[in-house]
């Protein structure tokens, strides 16, 4: 259908919920694979990680320092309140890779890996490794909000956010890119 008058609000919300649930299930499978690779033999339940009913904020792209992925966690106490809110839960899914010769970009991923293990954020903040087109597809389709907070004026276009908006994802951005 190309005429939005033929799609009811209920159908639209049902579709958004379906693609978010698919993203959550995909992320759980990826996290299980990551864990088995890093700590084989360890049994961790991944079915409790991420909530299909929670507002899902995504950040998936090449990791470069100017893109400032971990910036939002500078307000750590506020983030903890958001993810712990039982009435309106929020969760974060990060994915990406640094350029092979970008050591600073590689180091920029480390705080996210450590944050996901923090007891107050566990299960609400995840990092999906081995970012590729398949991960990108799942993320741009399933996230509710796309995070974009690069250092101005360094973002040329912000295509990941453009793709996410085509799937009904809202942008949470500074005035750069997009």
Language model segments and positions:
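Catalytic cores of carbohydrate-active enzymes across secretory and cytosolic contexts
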Residues: 1-178
């Amino acid at each position: 259908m190309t005429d939005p008058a033929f799609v009811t609000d209920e159908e639209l919300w049902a579709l958004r919920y379906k693609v978010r649930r698919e993203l959550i299930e995909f992320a759980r499978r990826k996290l299980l694979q990551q864990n088995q690779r890093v700590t084989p033999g360890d049994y961790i339940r991944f079915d409790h990680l991420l909530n299909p009913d929670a507002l899902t904020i995504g950040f998936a792209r090449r990791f470069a320092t100017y893109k400032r992925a971990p910036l939002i966690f500078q307000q750590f106490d506020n983030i903890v309140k958001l993810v712990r809110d039982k009435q309106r839960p929020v969760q974060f899914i990060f994915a990406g890779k640094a350029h092979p010769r970008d050591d600073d970009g590689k180091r920029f991923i480390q705080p996210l890996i450590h944050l996901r293990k923090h007891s107050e954020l566990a299960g609400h903040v995840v990092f999906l490794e081995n970012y590729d087109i398949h991960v990108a597809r799942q993320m741009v389709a399933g996230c509710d909000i796309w995070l974009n907070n690069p250092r101005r004026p360094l973002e040329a276009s912000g295509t990941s956010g453009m793709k996410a908006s085509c799937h009904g994802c809202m942008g949470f951005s500074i005035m750069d890119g997009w």
